[in-house]
């Protein structure tokens, strides 16, 4: 979406992607959720002492 609309602000892109996400079924969301869980586990293994500090 960002490549198709290079002048669009990140906040607008996020809103549109969020709206698209809400339209997906649970089955369509599942691969993304599974990948996020996998990546979280990898990150925790590689950086066990990591603490988020904004």
Curated annotation (Swiss-Prot):
Gene3D superfamilies the UniProt entry points to: High mobility group box domain
Keywords: DNA-binding, Nucleus
GO MF terms held by the record: DNA binding
GO biological process, one term: developmental process
DNA-binding region of this protein: 1-54
Pfam families: HMG_box (PF00505)
SUPFAM superfamilies assigned: HMG-box (SSF47095)
Annotated SMART domains: HMG (SM00398)
InterPro entries: HMG_box_dom, HMG_box_dom_sf, SRY-related_HMG-box_TF-like
The UniProt record lists the keyword DNA damage: no
GO cellular-component term (any): nucleus
Localization terms from the record: Nucleus
Domain of life (superkingdom): Eukaryota
Predominant place of localization: nucleus
Protein's recorded name: SRY-related protein CH3
Organism: Gallus gallus (Chicken)
């Amino acid at each position: 979406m960002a490549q198709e609309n290079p002048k669009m602000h990140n906040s607008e892109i996020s809103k549109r992607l969020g709206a698209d996400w809400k339209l997906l079924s649970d089955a369509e969301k599942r691969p993304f959720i599974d990948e996020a869980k996998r990546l979280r586990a990898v990150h925790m293994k590689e950086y066990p002492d990591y603490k988020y500090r904004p």
